[in-house]
Amino acid sequence: MLLPRWFAEALLLLLSILACSNAAFIGVNIGTDLTNMPPPSDIVTLLKSQQITHVRLYDANSHMLKAFANTSIEVMVGVTNEEILKIGRFPSAAAAWVNKNVAAYIPSTNITAIAVGSEVLTTIPHVAPILASALNNIHKALVASNLNFKVKVSSPMSMDIMPKPFPPSTSTFSPSWNTTVYQLLQFLKNTGSFFMLNAYPYYGYTTANGIFPLDYALFKQLSPVKQIVDPNTLLHYNSMFDAMVDAAYYSMEALNFSKIPVVVTETGWPSSGGSDEAAATVANAETFNTNLIKRVLNNSGPPSQPDIPINTYIYELYNEDKRSGPVSERNWGILFPNGTSVYPLSLSGGSSSAALNGSSMFCVAKADADDDKLVDGLNWACGQGRANCAAIQPGQPCYLPNDVKSHASFAFNDYYQKMKSAGGTCDFDGTAITTTRDPSYRTCAYTGSLNANATNGNFPPDALGPASPLGGNANARIIFSYHLPILAPLALTLLQLLLQHDRLL
């Protein structure tokens, strides 16, 4: 039987509400422009250990998607900016993309969203006219695969498409983009999807020339004389983050669209910058992300939409040290490329307290590494690198098996554990790799291991090298949690509507 139009619209509205009615979550963006990118399996192990349940990928990397299989972690995949033109012009290209990058992995991998491009209007404006077509073609391909209710489609937008975001109540989208934005919003409304927004208070603060105080950008409490108030609505804004999200809601209302949920697909704060980037500090980054997590997980929306939580993805998991541009561009991550924490980051109210430190990441020899190169690396680690190699001497707990890969792994790891917080890497001329799997065995405990049954012998731990200059980051903790949704009332509403419809037939 065909459902009447009113019921179809109610169903779409309910599905849209369901998509964002869960208790708010904090996710992370995973960029890959870094040296010594950890293997996907190790990244997933790390995410699971910290109870991170939502991630955004900037493409649809097959190795990453396979690693996320059977984890329940919700994955947002990306159509790259370079792929949009072809997908927008050819429905067959969209179908092929969905079949290859989404349908092939579901249900094992929990793909729940597709981000079509990133900041398309402001970075590749010549593609803007075809963006709506690309969105529709991807959605039609999902419909054909019966995945349109599970996987939502949208396109992340920059704050730059709103020229004057303050006061939020008067914010509008740039008139030059009204046609494209209107098409986007109509698509989001029709498909029950959400508006993806990249909102960076760091840039809002640094480009405002002192108009707004730093504390406002960092979620810090302002004194009564510095309170930020919208003069038109008299709504108080305790953070620039909330004002940015509300600016998006008001901009949508200006085009007669309401209740399309905003999901912040990128936000964060750089931990280091150049001489002209004074606000990019470890202290500010730690403060921003710590307060951001608390803000998002209080499960409320911005002042104009208090009942719509702000699901948010932190930018980003790793410092992408290969990125070009200002120093800050390479320092948005909460982890260094070698896996150590940039600063302590914790989430109050979570049940996990697992440490993100040396005990969760080890450095070992690659299985296919050349033995001659391993010998060179082993000699360097135990010599100039000043690793503690006493445990791999004859008669000691880690001497057997007596082969170069085993000995090199122990030496590489000891050096790595001691020096990573000071910038030491796990490379050794391409012969080493990081892993979250503890390589300890029998009575041989690798440095950083929590294996109480193994021992590295009763000898001075610094027999062949000094203690590592580990700083406060060595025991830094990052804790993420996820509150389970309470969907029963909404599900009941849907059921009641369906029963009423049946009785009318």
Swiss-Prot record:
This is Glucan endo-1,3-beta-glucosidase 4. It is found in: Cell membrane. One of its GO terms (molecular function) is glucan endo-1,3-beta-D-glucosidase activity. Residues 475-505 form a propeptide. Belongs to the glycosyl hydrolase 17 family. It comes from Arabidopsis thaliana (Mouse-ear cress). PROSITE patterns: GLYCOSYL_HYDROL_F17. One of its GO terms (cellular component) is cytosol. One of its GO terms (biological process) is carbohydrate metabolic process. Pfam families: Glyco_hydro_17, X8. The keyword Signal applies. Its main location: membrane. Disulfide bonds join C363-C426. PANTHER family: GLUCAN ENDO-1,3-BETA-GLUCOSIDASE BG1-RELATED-RELATED. The keyword Transcription regulation does not apply. It is a lipid-anchor; GPI-anchor. It catalyses: Hydrolysis of (1->3)-beta-D-glucosidic linkages in (1->3)-beta-D-glucans. Contains two additional disulfide bonds. Its EC number is 3.2.1.39. A lipid is attached at A474 (GPI-anchor amidated alanine). The active site is at E119 (proton donor), E266 (nucleophile). Glycans are attached at N70, N110, N178, N256, N298, N338, N357, N453. It comes from the Eukaryota. Keywords: Cell membrane, Disulfide bond, Glycoprotein, Glycosidase, GPI-anchor, Hydrolase, Lipoprotein, Membrane, Plant defense, Signal. Residues 1-23 form the signal peptide.
